Curated annotation (Swiss-Prot):
Protein name: Nucleotide-binding protein Mflv_3714
Record function comment: Displays ATPase and GTPase activities.
Biased composition (Basic and acidic residues): 1-22
Taxonomic source organism: Mycolicibacterium gilvum (strain PYR-GCK) (Mycobacterium gilvum (strain PYR-GCK))
Alphabetical list of PANTHER family matching this protein: RNASE ADAPTER PROTEIN RAPZ (PTHR30448:SF0)
List of residues binding GTP: D101, V102, R103, S104
């Protein structure tokens, strides 16, 4: 079952809740906490909660980037059903995260109920609690021009105070508390990645795309490299009909002076760039390699580069040959 299909099944008759944007932080203290998976049944469950505006939405996005199935603002009564679907799906879905907030009535009781329900399934959910100082929360709400969910006819500061008091018991029992007052989005991402580092590898998705310059540059490329410095197999009669995926063409291209040196140097350069992208929270990268027609040299070099990149456990690599078949 796809994530979207699972989400649709779970929502059923529940009303949709639109995320208001105030939980995406935009503002670094150092947090070095880790939380261990206590479940022995292969399903790991995390409940993300905390003060409105403290960064729950950002935390949810980080977990999703790390490969978790994330349900944002799922009604509490459906969280146990979400876990049941995860259990039924076997090992394909092993990490589930649910975002809970005070917009659900009787929030503290709801959280206790969810914990109790999951306990009957031999699952001990971990609770991540996000908070921030009052002045930071006020600033974030004012910047987003949103009202606090508990504000009502009160002032913004009073709404924040009411929520902080309501959630005090939840904070006290949380497995991990993150204060986002001085954290940027990247800082929060780093904190969550460190907390879950023992069980999750932060993969970067790299697409290596070959193309022909005569058809234009790929618009989605993050970096472009030109391999027209290599001799063109087009001018060799026995190679012309074939593509860079053909063994003879590949051996010809990779056997040229400078081909291996290029691949070694470019591979090292990309490792530096990818590490920088990862620190900045960028999880997707397109590397374009071009030749004249996108049939021989760029195809062979793209395949060879992708094979080198695929040796890293932190990368998910795919190859795309944009212009094959256009001639």
């Amino acid at each position: 079952m796809t994530r979207q299909g699972m989400r649709d099944d779970l929502r059923g008759e529940a009303d949709s809740v639109v995320h208001d944007g105030t939980d995406d932080i935009d503002n670094e203290n150092d947090i070095d906490n880790g939380i261990d998976n206590e479940n022995g049944n292969g399903i790991d469950v995390v409940l993300v909660t905390g003060l409105s505006g403290a960064g729950r939405g950002t935390a949810a996005k980080v977990l999703e980037d790390l490969g978790w199935y994330v349900a944002d603002n799922l009604p509490p009564e459906l969280i146990a059903q979400m876990v049941d679907l995860g259990l039924a799906a076997g090992s394909r879905i092993t990490q589930l995260a649910a975002v809970m907030d005070v917009r659900s009535r009787g929030f503290t009781g709801d959280l206790d109920w969810v914990r109790s329900e999951l306990a009957t399934r031999n699952i001990v959910p971990r609770v991540v609690f996000l908070e921030a100082s009052d002045d930071i929360l006020v600033r974030r709400y004012e910047q987003n021009r949103r009202s606090h969910p508990l504000q009502g006819n009160q002032t913004l500061a009073e709404g924040i105070a009411a929520e902080r008091a309501m959630l005090a018991p939840v904070r006290a029992s949380a497995d991990l508390v993150i204060d986002t007052s001085a954290l940027s989005v990247h800082g929060l991402r780093d904190s969550i990645e460190r907390a879950f580092a023992a069980e999750t590898v932060a993969h970067t998705n790299v697409t290596v795309e070959s193309f022909g310059y005569k058809y234009g540059l790929p618009m989605d490329a993050d970096t472009v490299m030109d391999v027209r410095f290599l001799p063109n197999p087009h001018w060799i009669d026995r190679l012309r009909p074939h593509t860079g995926q053909n063994a003879d063409v590949r051996d010809y291209v990779l056997g040229q002076p400078g081909a291996d040196e290029f691949l070694d140097s470019y591979h090292q350069l990309l490792n530096v760039v990818i590490d920088g992208y990862r620190r900045e929270g960028k999880r997707y990268m397109t590397v374009a390699i071009g030749c004249t027609g996108g049939k021989h040299r760029s195809v062979a070099m793209a395949e060879a580069l992708a094979a080198r990149l695929a040796g890293s456990d932190a990368l998910t690599v795919r190859v795309l040959h944009r212009d094959l078949g256009r001639e």
